[in-house]
Amino acid sequence: MLAQSCCLRLLILLLLFTSICSVSKKSLKYFRNRKLRERRIKLFGTKKTEIQSLLISTWNYTDANLQAWSVLQQGHRRTRQAVIQGCMACQNQRCGRLLAGRSSPDTEGALTLEAAIMDGESLEYGAVAGMDGVRNAILVADAVLKYTKHSVLVGKSATKFARSLGYKEEYLTDARTKNVLKKWSSNGCQPNFWRDVHPSPAENCGPYSPLPEHLHQHPMHQEYAITQGQHDQLAFLALDAEGKFHVASQSSGAQFRIPGRVGDSAVPGAGIYADNEVGGAVASGDGDVLMRHLPAFLAVEAMRAGKDPDQAAEWVVQRLLRHNTEFNGAVVVVNRRGIYAAACAGLDEFHFVVSGGKEYLSMARVERVKCLERENEVIDGGPKGLFPTIPEKQKVP
């Protein structure tokens, strides 16, 4: 009887110990999951978080922004059509040195285009680069995303792809292009993108031959000035009330570039990037620097790691400046709730246009930010001008 009593007590103690361990494990798992959930809410918000529709474009072209915004307001899931509309509007108007100005040729006088579009939901990306003979490159980039398993097509093969889908081929170079090239040639081909060659590219047009390696001058200096109205790339970001992002970029390429050069507009993460779980970003500036550092991608990942948009924007620009002290350009960052910020370097100030948002629902406004090199200032919203006139819409297929 004594032995049976002892066994019964041991069994009860064993069951009690097992029960306590089970409760402890469940409690630990609960608190771990709670911490993970709290962190996710901090980073990404909850389903109940109100999202404000937003349309942002780089530089100060309000007409193109308003056309894109009007498309975004037409109905459900219009972010893709909105950013395409913005790119098309700038392509067919005079936005900086874009195609309408026909003043951004390569050193052989050719006008080639590049464009890209990214879906923040699927993370699919479509782009073309070095494409000649087709005006609306953004439509071809969108076709790469929709109809192929590739991400980027380049050169004459991109033109051939566009023709196969029915896009009209046209001769883009005209008298204005030839005049721009003639002036450049008469000025000793300045500026240009050669280095460490003979004769000196700072004084001569070439042809060039490589210098011996011991004569190379490794530091690269920024000679390609980017100012208001004197740039070749624009980017658009659209966010709808469901939290869906699309970003797009279109460019005629750096003026007097070496033929064959691919720019940041076609490189994922350099000029544009978006992820619906986190947010989106667009960048503009010295494309060769942007391609080396992928600032749009870095900005989104900085927000994923917990930074606010203003912190992410400034961090990215400061990182670029650490490696490229003469960099000029900017980044605009938007989180998944529509909160935006921008930072820049190397300019007096950077302009971008915003439509939508919580306080100013239907008016494009030019935002201005003083660049970090001079004022160490970051912008995070606020109206700077109202542009209520909406120009005639262009149809987006």
Curated annotation (Swiss-Prot):
Q: Report the SUPFAM superfamilies cross-referenced here.
A: N-terminal nucleophile aminohydrolases (Ntn hydrolases)
Query: Which CDD domains is this protein grouped with?
Result: Glycosylasparaginase
A GO CC annotation given for this chain: lysosome
Q: Report the source organism.
A: Drosophila simulans
The protein depicted here goes by the name L-asparaginase-like protein GD25160
Domain of life of the organism in this record? Eukaryota
Q: Which UniProt keywords apply?
A: Disulfide bond, Signal
- Gene3D superfamilies in the record: (Glycosyl)asparaginase
